[in-house]
């Protein structure tokens, strides 16, 4: 069996080598010719799996080691009888930890504020639920908005109420362009007008959920602290926007070693179910041990003293800013940052909590 895999996927050889010949390719530039005689295709969100890519191929299975599916033309896949799978929730823990890290980097005093600090979470799916848990461990008040999900552990509010009440807003929705609750440009001029000027905004979901032109106008007006891991016109990012952001990172919020490995395992399991193979491999056997920071220690004390050692978000911010050339970060530089990213470990690997 020929298997084509994005070169940036983790542990593909470990999980898939026994099934056939694996060809590693750059996901963003994958062509019909690359996959024409492949039976399985393993991708990330940078690959648009659409009619032009999959028509007249030998493909029987497409696995995307990602939370989202907006890069998959599911209608086309089903038309051609191609089984597909994604990895919903694979890196949810890493994204939740990213948000906590970003907030504490911007204001370490949040560790002491307890319920004086209100975190508003837009989207209460896999990531949102884990972020609720982690934020409540720190004593923060959490409010949430999701038209499809209500959580008993928090105050569920309207979108407008969340914008008006939260001290920080973190976005965790898929990108959708149709329907009553479409998320494309959910954060537009009207939404920014409702936000309090000193409310922190974090987007680690999908870039086009935030209308970039409206965001730039808002920051110019309010000097708001904004953290972006995703960008509307990604992978090209303007220097103008970068210079306005409190923190910027190259779409790596979910890039923990555990998250990447978990994503590959999930599409491996779906692959085995499709082709009738026994599921007998676990990613945990491939992970190295790392230093225990948390066991026997107070959570807040550890975060106060060791946060930058667990995850140095300032370095990621510096790295993307160093890639600016002629007024922007270009695709090649952006993709290299992601390809060469030194995968961090989740808190649990250091003996810490996990939602």
UniProtKB/Swiss-Prot annotation:
Q: What is a GO molecular function of this protein?
A: protein dimerization activity
Spell out the reaction equation it catalyses: 4-phospho-D-erythronate + NAD(+) = (R)-3-hydroxy-2-oxo-4-phosphooxybutanoate + NADH + H(+)
Residues that hold NAD(+) according to the record: 146, 229, 254
The record's active-site residues are 206, 234, 251 (proton donor)
Q: Which CDD domains match?
A: ErythrP_dh (cd12158)
Q: Write out the GO biological process terms.
A: 'de novo' pyridoxal 5'-phosphate biosynthetic process; pyridoxine biosynthetic process
Recorded metabolic or biological pathway in which this protein acts: Cofactor biosynthesis; pyridoxine 5'-phosphate biosynthesis; pyridoxine 5'-phosphate from D-erythrose 4-phosphate: step 2/5
Q: Which domain of life is it from?
A: Bacteria
**What keywords tag this UniProt record?**
Cytoplasm, NAD, Oxidoreductase, Pyridoxine biosynthesis
Is Oxidoreductase one of the keywords? yes
Q: Which Pfam families match?
A: 2-Hacid_dh, 2-Hacid_dh_C, DUF3410
| Known EC number | 1.1.1.290
Q: Which GO terms describe its cellular component?
A: cytosol
Outline the subunit composition: Homodimer.
What's its job?
Catalyzes the oxidation of erythronate-4-phosphate to 3-hydroxy-2-oxo-4-phosphonooxybutanoate.
What does the similarity note say? Belongs to the D-isomer specific 2-hydroxyacid dehydrogenase family. PdxB subfamily.
Q: What is this protein called?
A: Erythronate-4-phosphate dehydrogenase
Naturally occurring in which organism (per UniProt):
Acinetobacter baumannii (strain AYE)
At the highest ranks, the source species' classification is: Bacteria, Pseudomonadati, Pseudomonadota, Gammaproteobacteria, Moraxellales
């Amino acid at each position: 069996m020929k298997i084509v895999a994005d070169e940036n996927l983790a542990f593909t050889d470990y999980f898939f080598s026994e099934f056939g010949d694996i060809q590693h390719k750059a996901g963003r530039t994958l062509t019909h010719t690359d996959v024409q005689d492949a039976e399985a295709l393993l991708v990330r969100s940078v690959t648009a799996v659409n009619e032009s890519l999959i028509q007249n191929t030998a493909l029987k299975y497409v696995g995307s080691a990602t939370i989202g599916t907006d890069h998959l033309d599911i209608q086309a896949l089903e038309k051609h009888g191609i089984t597909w799978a994604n990895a919903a929730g694979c890196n949810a823990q890493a994204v939740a930890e990213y948000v906590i890290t970003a907030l504490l980097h911007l204001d370490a005093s949040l560790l002491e504020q307890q319920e004086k600090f209100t975190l508003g979470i837009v989207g209460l799916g896999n990531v949102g639920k884990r972020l609720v848990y982690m934020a409540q461990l720190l004593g923060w008040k959490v409010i949430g908005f999701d038209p499809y999900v209500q959580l008993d552990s928090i105050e569920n509010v309207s979108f407008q109420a969340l914008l008006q009440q939260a001290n920080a807003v973190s976005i965790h929705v898929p990108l959708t362009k149709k329907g009553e609750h479409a998320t494309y440009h959910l954060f537009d001029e009207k939404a920014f007008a409702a936000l309090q000027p000193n409310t922190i905004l974090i987007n680690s979901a999908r870039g086009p959920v935030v209308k970039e032109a409206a965001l730039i106008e808002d920051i110019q007006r309010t000097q708001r602290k904004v953290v972006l891991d995703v960008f509307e016109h990604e992978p090209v990012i303007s220097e103008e926007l970068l210079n306005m952001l409190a923190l910027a990172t190259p779409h790596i919020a979910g890039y923990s070693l555990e998250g990447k490995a978990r994503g590959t395992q999930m599409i491996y399991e779906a692959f085995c179910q499709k082709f009738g193979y026994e599921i007998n491999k676990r990613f945990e056997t491939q992970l190295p041990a790392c230093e225990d920071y948390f066991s026997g220690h107070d959570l807040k004390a550890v975060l106060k003293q060791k946060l930058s050692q667990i995850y140095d978000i300032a370095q990621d911010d510096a790295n993307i800013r160093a890639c600016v050339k002629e007024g922007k970060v270009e695709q090649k530089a952006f993709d290299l940052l992601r390809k060469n990213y030194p995968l961090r470990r989740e808190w649990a690997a250091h003996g810490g909590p996990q939602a």
